[in-house]
């Protein structure tokens, strides 16, 4: 702690808000209406390729209009964070932030090992998925606006009509995963601990929070009838079950779980619930639709890890080379190099996209709001895949281990929590390769 840092931390927060204001003001005219870039994003799912290209280029052009403004904010933020580290006696901001985030169970070098493993194991697998996408779409090369559309030209899944149906069917799914988890969700329904439907004037987003005195969870979201809503409900359900399972721990500090494992609870639940999404289990889908949902989910996991590595590696570079990172041109260059390392593929044509690729670091809010907070998602996803793999071998034991690990709250180290759940807190080639093989198997089973 350094009293000198109090005004600097306030300044850091204010600069993040300035960044938000810039991003929030980014709108374009689309089909006669002014829309935000977020509101424009569903066009990327449409089968009309010319419209996708038009929307992508329009969004890219609008983002680049704020290039100078975001560069200026970045310089101020970086200088502020350099001063915070210096005032506290740390050699660089990464070292200060590591301790601030209570990262006692892994080091920066562990993260760099994770990056290298992703490059070696996952990037080639992601490249195969891109090749399959290119061929299925009948294209010589993919363009950036071809990466989200369904490759078979199918309409998006439409699993439910209202929040009541979402509740009912998710309740059935949770009961199928484990009767006790079904009981927990029943308590949430009975005690009005769910606010799921989208309505005018409601705050955006979705999350699970806890009422610490009552030791009960509350789930908030904005369901509109999409498959993403189903995933969100099941994901947040995993967080809610974490609250229930750890409720017997006497002190709130014991129930405070790091994100590296908190997200295992939610991500693993998405996978553990996946066999029960079908109508004959009281769920939403036909067998064919359920297989589609599973494959899309697993493929997104593969595609996420390389992007996560870009975001995390960029921050390791920036905060250990702050003098270079104070020049936004160097940041553009570093991001481009990382993009080539983790995201470039012979199957994608990025020609004429240089500036929008190199300024990709402008678009990831975590860099401005919560530095170094992103790798946790990659770690947790790796843990969740291992738990899911256990369930394919012995479903009953996998669920028992999962619940036992949740009951520990934050009352153990990360390696101990992962081990209790039947997983390994490791980021080496072997661990990632085992996960990749499981995902590949899951995709094959989903197709049959």
For each of these PLM feature ranges, what is it?
Residues 35-52, 155, 159-234, 238-243, ...:
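Active-site-adjacent "gating/activation" loops or surface patches in catalytic cores
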Residues 58-66, 104-112, 149-159, 179, ...:
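Glycine- and acidic
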Residues 87-96, 131-146, 183-189, 249-255, ...:
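Short, glycine/acidic-rich hinge or "gate" loops at secondary-structure transitions
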Residues 238-252, 272:
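Catalytic Zn2+-binding segment of zinc metalloproteases
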Residues 1-157, 169:
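A well-structured
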Residues 120-121, 257-288, 297, 303, ...:
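Post-HExxH zinc-binding segment in Zn-dependent metallohydrolases
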Residues 141-169, 288-289, 298, 302-304, ...:
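Long, K/E/R/D-enriched contiguous segments that form extended
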Residues 103-105, 233, 241, 271, ...:
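C-terminal, non-catalytic "cap/extension" segments appended to globular domains
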């Amino acid at each position: 702690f350094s009293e000198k840092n109090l005004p600097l931390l306030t300044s850091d927060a204010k600069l993040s808000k300035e960044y938000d204001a810039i991003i929030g003001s980014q709108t374009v005219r689309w089909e006669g209406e002014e829309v935000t870039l977020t509101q424009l994003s569903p066009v990327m799912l449409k089968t009309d390729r010319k419209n996708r290209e038009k929307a992508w280029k329009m969004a890219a052009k609008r983002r680049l209009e704020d290039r100078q403004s975001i560069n200026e904010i970045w310089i101020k933020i970086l200088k502020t964070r350099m001063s915070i580290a210096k005032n506290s006696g740390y050699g660089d901001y990464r070292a200060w932030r590591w301790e601030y985030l209570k990262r006692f169970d892994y080091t920066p070098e562990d993260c760099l090992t994770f990056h290298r493993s992703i490059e070696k194991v996952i990037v080639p697998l992601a490249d195969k998925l891109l090749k399959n996408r290119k061929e299925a779409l009948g294209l010589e090369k993919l363009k950036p606006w071809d990466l989200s559309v369904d490759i078979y030209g199918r309409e998006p899944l439409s699993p439910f009509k209202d929040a009541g149906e979402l509740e009912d069917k998710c309740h059935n799914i949770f009961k199928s995963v484990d009767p006790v988890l079904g009981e927990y969700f029943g308590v949430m329904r009975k005690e009005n601990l769910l606010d799921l439907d989208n309505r005018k004037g409601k705050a955006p987003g979705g999350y699970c929070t806890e009422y610490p005195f009552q030791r009960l969870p509350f789930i908030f979201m904005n369901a509109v009838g999409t498959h993403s809503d189903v995933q969100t409900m099941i994901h947040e359900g995993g967080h809610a079950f974490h609250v229930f399972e750890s409720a017997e721990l006497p002190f709130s500090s014991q129930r405070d779980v790091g994100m590296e494992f908190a997200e295992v609870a939610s991500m693993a639940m998405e996978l553990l619930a996946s066999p029960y999404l079908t109508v004959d289990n009281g769920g939403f889908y036909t067998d064919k639709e359920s297989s589609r949902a599973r494959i899309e989910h697993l493929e997104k996991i593969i595609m996420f890890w390389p992007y996560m590595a870009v975001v995390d590696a960029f921050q390791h570079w920036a905060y250990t080379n702050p003098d270079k990172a104070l020049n936004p041109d160097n940041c553009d260059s570093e991001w481009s190099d990382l993009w080539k390392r983790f995201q470039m593929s012979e199957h994608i044509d990025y020609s004429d996209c240089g500036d929008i690729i190199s300024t990709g670091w402008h678009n990831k809010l975590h860099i401005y709001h919560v530095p170094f907070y992103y790798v946790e998602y990659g770690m947790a996803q790796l843990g969740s895949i291992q738990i899911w793999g256990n369930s394919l071998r012995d479903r009953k034991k996998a669920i028992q281990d999962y619940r036992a690990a949740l009951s520990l709250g934050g009352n153990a180290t990360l390696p101990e929590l992962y081990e209790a759940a039947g997983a390994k807190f490791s980021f080496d080639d072997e661990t990632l390769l085992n996960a990749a093989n499981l995902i590949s198997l899951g995709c094959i089973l989903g197709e049959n």
